[in-house]
Amino acid sequence: NVIKQRSLIIRSIRRFFEELYFIEVETPTLLSVNSGANAKPFTTHYNALGEDFFLRVAPELSLKKLLVGGMERIFEIGKNYRNEGMSKRHNPEFTSLEAYSAYTDCNSMIKVFMELVNHLSLSYDGPELKIEVISMKDLVRQAISGAEVTYENLNEVFEIYVAPFLINPTIVT
């Protein structure tokens, strides 16, 4: 059933990162200031303090503070909350995985992510996956050749003309 599968997958993710010497951390989900992704937060009133607080939209800033503080390899599997629309692709409460490693670049973390995806696929008798790494701009250019793409409209054009048609495992940079 889905609950057991989810538990096994999360356990596999933890083992994968532990074998790479990452430390699992847990960062606050109740924050005095909104931080992280450009998303609308849920708010709540903290009665004891008489102040409004926010449920986190992403753990990114808290995790990066740990990096600056000397934690070299960290990951978190945790809940995030976004007070926005709901769809087949978006749920206001969701679990995410974020991992960071000091002294590396995005290409190193892309490699770790590709290894993780294949580790999970092979762990559950799936195939080894060929994962393509391609820029959002290049995908948009392929989808609508000749169209002018600017930084301002890139994400919107991607969501309309590219994302619905991505089938194979793809890392969009």
Set out the residue ranges of the language-model regions.
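Metal-assisted phosphate- and nucleotidyl-transfer catalytic regions
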Residues: 35-41, 116-173
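Class II aminoacyl-tRNA synthetase-like tRNA-binding/catalytic domains
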Residues: 1-107, 118, 148-152, 169
